[in-house]
């Protein structure tokens, strides 16, 4: 079964958690976009929800599918955030940020009563780190920050991190996030202690946020061959 089909199964299963009257955090990325299309169909059938988008792209896809949006600063409560992930381990720790939306995704996830993560089975890992860890940094002094990120990762137990500035598709200009920052992609191979990496990176002034999501996801829905497997903490 293709990854697309598995993502669709996971997104469809996530709809079971949605009820009328909810304000939803709307994640970013390919699986989140599938969810938005399915959510739009439910809204046409009478489901009454509104969403807080975590990226300009998500806002665009939501609007195209008839999902009502509300400004994040006009929200009192976010019931559920529904998002994808680049990696998920057995403790529901995540790596996110392949789509460069990690800061806003984390803000919304932290503000939500529940975070649901939808993935295809290829995203399940025993140990985080095969997927490069994105670190969002201020553009001012980013080269200095990159050096500090490298040293922090080594102190946190990453043997040979490779820290690279993410660039646009042309490979020339640096990619700029919706918030106006740069992304450092940190190839780690394995992250034995996500908490240590979290603490080390947060101590660097130039680091805005990083793609480790710890103690946030409480439901992981995995699209597998012919079905969706729901795991809850």
Curated annotation (Swiss-Prot):
The keyword Isomerase applies. It comes from the Bacteria. The active site is at 105 (proton acceptor). GO terms for molecular function: ribose-5-phosphate isomerase activity. Keywords: Isomerase. Pathway: Carbohydrate degradation; pentose phosphate pathway; D-ribose 5-phosphate from D-ribulose 5-phosphate (non-oxidative stage): step 1/1. Substrate binds at residues 28-31, 83-86, 96-99, 123. Belongs to the ribose 5-phosphate isomerase family. Homodimer. PANTHER family: RIBOSE-5-PHOSPHATE ISOMERASE 3, CHLOROPLASTIC-RELATED. This is Ribose-5-phosphate isomerase A. It comes from Maricaulis maris (strain MCS10).
């Amino acid at each position: 079964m293709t990854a697309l089909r598995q993502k669709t199964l996971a997104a469809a299963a996530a709809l079971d958690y949605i009820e009328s009257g909810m304000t939803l955090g709307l994640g970013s990325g390919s699986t989140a976009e599938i969810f938005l299309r399915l959510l739009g169909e439910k809204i046409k059938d009478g489901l009454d929800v509104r969403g807080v988008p975590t990226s300009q792209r998500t806002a665009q896809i939501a609007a195209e599918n008839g999902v009502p949006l509300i400004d994040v600063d006009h929200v009192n409560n976010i019931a559920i955030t529904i998002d994808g992930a680049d990696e998920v381990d057995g403790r529901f720790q995540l790596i996110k940020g392949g789509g460069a939306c990690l800061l806003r995704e984390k803000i919304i996830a932290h503000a939500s009563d529940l975070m649901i993560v939808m993935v295809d089975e290829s995203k399940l890992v025993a140990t985080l780190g095969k997927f490069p860890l994105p670190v969002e940094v201020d553009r001012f002094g980013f080269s200095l920050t990159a050096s500090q990120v490298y040293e922090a990762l080594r102190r946190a137990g990453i043997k040979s991190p490779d820290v690279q500035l993410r660039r646009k598709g042309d490979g020339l200009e640096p990619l700029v996030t919706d918030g106006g920052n740069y992304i450092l992609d940190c190839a780690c191979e394995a992250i034995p202690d996500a908490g240590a990496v979290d603490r080390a990176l947060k101590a660097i002034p130039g680091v805005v946020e990083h793609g480790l999501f710890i103690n946030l996801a409480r439901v992981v829905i995995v699209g597998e061959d012919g079905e969706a497997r729901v795991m809850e903490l």
